[in-house]
Amino acid sequence: MNRSDQEAYLMLPIINELKQLGGQSTSKELKRNVVADDKLIQENVLTSFKKSLSTGRKYLPFNFPFNFAITNLVMAGMLERPKKGTLKLTKKARDFHGTGKELSDQVYEISLPEWYTRSEKNKKEKIALHQIKEVNKSELDIDDGLEEDN
């Protein structure tokens, strides 16, 4: 499975595991339980670190689809983050009883437009920041060209 397939697949186990845990859990506990209870997820995903070619830092590839699945579920109103590191089911998630495909379709219908909006906002902010840097640079160039009369 590619990353986006993993992300879509993880949504239902996340919801089901939170239901088993009483509707609320820490992210770490939830991740461990999802991996332990799902037969399609290899248990070594929580110990198989890779090294980033660009930074040299170690990371867990499983964290990417897991965290994006969580964020999409939050965007779709299925989960809440009452405090940092804690996830909580919403009524919408507690009432969901469909398939993984039905869940991911429902979630992506809401979250994909939100991702697009975020992306556009980030692009605009990046352009604005670049323009500010260019103005500041040109002001420095002008200042460097001025000679003081003594």
Feature names for model-found ranges:
Residues 3-5, 35-66:
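Short, positively charged loop/turn segments that connect secondary-structure elements
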Residues 85-90:
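Minor-groove-contacting beta-hairpin "wing" of winged helix-turn-helix DNA-binding domains
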Residues 2-28:
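Positively charged, polyanion-binding regions of nucleic-acid-associated proteins
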